[in-house]
Every structure is written in structure tokens, then in C-alpha cells.
């Protein structure tokens, strides 16, 4: 996913009528940048996904792809630079400063905006994570440029402008947004929306160190400690290989046990559509779709889910989608690979039993070995 153009994209003639001449101060902005998000010294996977997408955009534009790294001096920051090259970057802009050890909006915004003003990128991409959303908004505001959030598709049009597609009107429509008269063109993309690129053995390229300083007394926010939010019960749907999800077709909260049993049987995780969270049947971290988690599993089983646009954009990156619904005209059958027109409540126990029987010999073999 990430290359599909929305029907909402205006024709070239309509865009031409909206487009003014790019102001003189923006005409030398070039290249594609990806902000590399570090989590306690480790690169967030969404950064690699964005490097893959950024590589494609840079090749279309005939420009370079740069990874942007803000962090403290040390091996973890240099390792992040090496990883940027392995996932497609041509060069890395590096700001090493002890004040950037932990994320705080003020120093990160100042460092990134200084980099942009100095080196003038045409496109700047960030992950739509908690950190990325906070940083992207403040950087765009500081630079007086546009920002398209939570994109499901990125492309370059015939004029070389970034076409950023995202759902709108509660997920019922897709729109394509352009930043025509400001630079850089900024967009955020959630984890797992873009495909993870293949890691290469590309040698380390050019690293440009940017000398940047800020005084601690100029920063309002102070870090007093770090408490991990690594709770074992939290859903990790975004990176699960197998996901089973339920919707309103399950009829009541008790029937959620059916998707949990199936997920447990086939070694997967479970989730739900937005209406079930709104009803209080499942917590928000189990929601799948544009306003929840975006998933890209090898197998996705949707039970009793109609498949509205906001759900579709969160799941259509799956390798195999199996849809179970009583309505043969449900939108989910338009993009599912396998469709079963039946009552999910009756079908799920039979499916779980079939998987149990099929997997039993393999399970016994693993125990013996």
C-alpha cells in the first residue's frame, strides 16, 4: 500500500487553477527527508518503512533520500545512521547533542527546524507515532508549512508535487491533499501502512553533522525520570503475523470469545472494528482501522465486519484477507481475498475446530522434538 491514488484527487486542470507560482524562497528546496525516530536508542520500525517509501519518491523526483537523526553522542546514534543507509538513504543529517537524549518538544523542534532552514528539503516524512505527531505539528507550525497527517498513500504527481492521501469524513471518503505554495511538504504515516523494505548491505554513505546547541535553561520541560509502559497485556496488533477481528456481526460482547479462541488456536492476535470499541466491548488498543491500528499480517480473518473505508485502509496491506459476513453486498467482500457468506457466530466455532484438528499433529510433533 502507499501507491494507490484516491478518486478524490483533483484533475491536473483543477490543480493548475489552484496552483500559484512557488515563492522564490522555496524554489531551491530539493530532496526527500525521513525523520528517524529513536526509542531508548533503538530505531522505531516505522522509520524503516518510511525510508522505503521515501526511496520510491526520491527516485521519481530524481533527488536524494536523507535520513534525519537527532540524538545524544554515542554508539546507538551512529548505529541508527548505519541502519538508515541499509534501508535506502543516500546520506544522513546528524545532530548529536546530550539534550536530545530524551524526547522533548522544544529542543527537537528547534533542531529539526534549524536543519530544514539550513538544508532546504522538498519533502519531510515522519512516523505518525505519539512522538512523531507531536513533533510534526510543531515543526510545521514553526515553518509555516502544510502537514497531512495519518496518510495511507503517498505519490508524486506530474508536476512533482507530493500527493498525500488520507481518509476523511469519518473514514467514508479518501482525499488527496497537496501543499502547493509552501515548503517543505510534510506528511506523517502510521506504522505498518507502508511495506517494510528489504534491508541491504549498502556501505555507509555520507554523514553530514549539523552543529547545533541549546541551553538546558532555555527548555521548559524537564526530564525527571523514565517509566516504561511495557505492559505485557498490551496488544501488539501492528506487527502480528495472524490477526482475527470481530465486528457488530458478532451480536454481543460474549461472542468475542469466539475470535479470541480462534486467534489462540492459530497463534495469532485479536482485534475489533471501531463500533465495538464505541460500545465498550473492547479496549481502544484492540481497534483496527484508520482511527486504530494499521496491520499488515500474513493472514487476517474478519468476522462480522462490514468493511467501511476507515477499516479497509487499516487492513488492506494483509497478504490474505478472509471475510465472514451474512451480507453478500458488504464492502469487505470488495477487497477480501476469500469471502464466506454466513453467520460468523455459527461459523467461527467450526473454523476453530477445523484448525485444532489440522494443527494437532504438528503440535504433537513439536512437543516430541
From Swiss-Prot:
The keyword Hydrolase does not apply. FAD binds at residues 299-327. Residues 1-20 are annotated as: Disordered. It comes from the Bacteria. It holds the Pfam family ETF_alpha. One of its GO terms (molecular function) is electron transfer activity. This is Protein FixB.
